[in-house]
Regions:
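Nucleic-acid nuclease catalytic cores
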Residues: 80-138, 142
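Solvent-exposed, charged helical/coil patches
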Residues: 1-46, 114, 120-145
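A short acidic/basic microdomain associated with nuclease active sites
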Residues: 41-59
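Structural motif corresponding to alpha-helix initiation and N-cap regions
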Residues: 63-64, 90
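Conserved catalytic cores of phosphodiester-cleaving nucleases, focusing on short active-site segments
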Residues: 24, 47, 67-85, 96
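Residue-level signature for short turns and capping positions that connect secondary-structure elements
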Residues: 54, 62, 76, 82-84, ...
């Protein structure tokens, strides 16, 4: 039986809450990352910790980032241990999604109160952004003539 994206994110969120309830607030991010990774494995949820993801600019690798955890090969987890999630944290996750073929990301904060933010970046929007960029570039080259 194939899991839906909602089933996958529910399983991840349940593991997140188990780790949060066990450890509580106050540890550094790496402790939570290791604990969540182990909890996902314990539940037989396929995941990879710290995978390096190439970032491309015009089909050339210009750098990479290291994701915290990728689950089911279809959900990026970005973990934080901060007082409160910020817009910058959300943008970081969206950029990670843009750099991959993965469309769903979860921002999980092990703060004073557990916080979860779900982000989706569809390939449809990626293609639309690329088409808009190409249209803008065409318009610029036409106007320069």
């Amino acid at each position: 039986m194939s899991l839906t994206q909602a089933d996958k994110t529910d399983a991840i969120i349940n593991a997140f809450y188990d780790v949060y309830n066990e450890l509580g607030y106050g540890f550094i991010e790496n402790v939570y990352q290791n604990a969540l990774y182990r909890e996902l494995l314990r539940r037989d949820i396929p995941c990879v910790a710290h995978p390096k993801i190439n970032v491309y600019y015009k089909d050339e690798v210009v750098g990479y980032y290291e994701a915290d955890i990728i689950v089911y090969n279809s959900v990026i987890l970005e973990l934080k241990a901060v007082t409160r999630l910020s817009k910058e944290h959300e943008l970081q996750l969206v950029n990670y999604l843009k750099a991959t073929d993965i469309e769903v990301g979860l921002l999980l904060n092990f703060g004073p109160k557990p916080e979860i933010s779900r982000k989706v970046f569809s390939h449809y929007y990626r293609e639309r952004l690329q088409n808009n960029s190409e249209s803008a570039a065409s318009a610029l080259s036409v106007s320069k003539k």
